[in-house]
């Protein structure tokens, strides 16, 4: 799980193939800089998965990965200030959606501090005019 930043002029929308959904993303890996990483935080990943599905007008969930679309391995979701407001409210309230998966581990109360640190970094990046994306490989 990771968040990247890039210059808005380096954003493209790509169709990743028949088994993947189109996604907005940095034009190349050289155009992006790592902003934040997480490990074994399935609840946060579920929150970003739900955000991606809403933004793309899709239905499904991560638990339906074998039956329908999944948010994994190449899709990116662009994060706005409004998204960060919603995420911050969910983190502060302990209201991230619960999720579990093979090798995912579990989210812990200690993740809250790290999530809030990410939100602060993402807000700074947006204020600098950068684009912020979330993605993951699982």
Language model segments and positions:
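Acidic (Asp/Glu-rich) sequence patches and key acidic residues
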Residues: 1-138
């Amino acid at each position: 799980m990771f968040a990247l930043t890039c210059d808005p002029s380096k954003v493209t929308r790509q169709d990743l193939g028949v088994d993947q959904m189109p996604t907005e993303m940095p034009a190349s890996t050289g155009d992006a800089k790592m902003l934040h990483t997480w490990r074994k935080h399935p609840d946060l990943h579920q929150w970003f998965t739900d955000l991606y599905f809403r933004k793309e007008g899709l239905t499904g969930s991560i638990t339906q990965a074998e039956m329908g679309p999944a948010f994994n391995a190449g899709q990116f979701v662009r994060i706005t200030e409004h998204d960060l407001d919603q995420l911050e409210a969910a983190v502060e309230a302990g209201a991230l959606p619960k999720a579990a998966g093979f090798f995912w581990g579990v989210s812990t109360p200690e993740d809250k501090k790290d999530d809030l640190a990410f939100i602060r970094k993402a807000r700074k990046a947006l204020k600098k005019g950068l684009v912020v994306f979330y993605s993951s490989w699982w």
